[in-house]
Amino acid sequence: MVQPQSRVKVVDNSGAKEIVCIRVLGKGRNQLSNIGDIIIGVVKEAIPNTPLKKSDIVRAVVVRTRKGLKRKNGIYIRFDDNAAVIVNKENNPRGTRIFGPVARELRDKSFMKIVSLAPEVI
């Protein structure tokens, strides 16, 4: 789960390396996000000479969490890190590559562009 003040690794080539979550969209008072939720974050670490700079405010989709996720068939899926992909207002990724696996639940939440760019869908 990702909540406000959580540090999240960015797994695309948009230029940011790490963001800090400041808001979870669509959750109301319960500010806990899971895989497929959109968060608002601030770039804390960025690669030089890229469009995203430190202290930029961005939208991102959570693609991996350390918290276990139970599927309908009874399988628990868990990742080693909390990771997100930076998206624009239309929920299309800003980068052109995605690094590492993403969860199959993104397909159910209609993030097909992210699923198609990912090297592995678990």
UniProtKB/Swiss-Prot annotation:
Cystine crosslinks: none
A GO biological-process term: translation
Chain segments annotated as transmembrane: none
Subcellular location: Plastid, Chloroplast
GO CC list: chloroplast; mitochondrial large ribosomal subunit
Classification via SUPFAM superfamilies: Ribosomal protein L14
Keyword rRNA-binding: yes
UniProt keyword annotation of Transmembrane present: no
Pfam family name, one: Ribosomal_L14
Top-rank lineage group of the source organism: Eukaryota
Listed InterPro entries: Ribosomal_uL14, Ribosomal_uL14_bac-type, Ribosomal_uL14_CS, Ribosomal_uL14_sf
GO-annotated molecular function: large ribosomal subunit rRNA binding; structural constituent of ribosome
Keyword terms: Chloroplast, Plastid, Ribonucleoprotein, Ribosomal protein, RNA-binding, rRNA-binding
NCBIfam families, sorted: rplN_bact (TIGR01067)
Annotated family: Belongs to the universal ribosomal protein uL14 family.
Protein's job: Binds to 23S rRNA.
Quaternary structure note: Part of the 50S ribosomal subunit.
Protein's UniProt name: Large ribosomal subunit protein uL14c
Protein source organism: Bigelowiella natans (Pedinomonas minutissima)
